[in-house]
Amino acid sequence: SGLKDSKLLRPTRRQNLVEPVKQWLVDSQVAHASPSEVDRFGIVGALRLAGFRALAQLAKRGHHPDSIILDGRDNWLSSADLFLSLADAEMADLMAISGELAPVTMQVKADASCAVVAAASVLAKVERDSLMAALPDPGYGWASNKGYAAPAHREAIATLGASEHHRRSWHLPGLDQYRQRLATGEN
């Protein structure tokens, strides 16, 4: 089938796997956290928020997973008290819609050894790349770099500064040069 970690597949191969993967899976849902949510909650809290958004959408369609496999060593989905305030209204609603959380298993490099995780990786990567390519682009090169720190993207940040699509809490390569140019009055 050629299904493996999405980062190891060429974009065309990933795209060609989307329909076969969707036919193979009982159901799937890709969910997102915005750059401002990553800044507000941290990456782990944002992962948890996106995870519960996906589970809530599955639950609305009547699908409740029997088990959950997370790629990595940390259980960011079940650790409510560590990363995201349960007082957050959206999170509380998502948890209520999702119902009781299935047992969670962590597996390092699961996308390389577990077909269902590799399938999820492909669906998520194709959707993310599509969203990035569709963003209004004043010169960041979203369609080619997909938001990663490619040299041209770093140069664009140095010239244009950060956009609403950049995470402000992270050190953005090129942003220091942009700030220095502003401070010295350079164009």
How does the language model describe each region?
Residues 1-187:
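RNase H-like, Mg2+-dependent phosphodiesterase core
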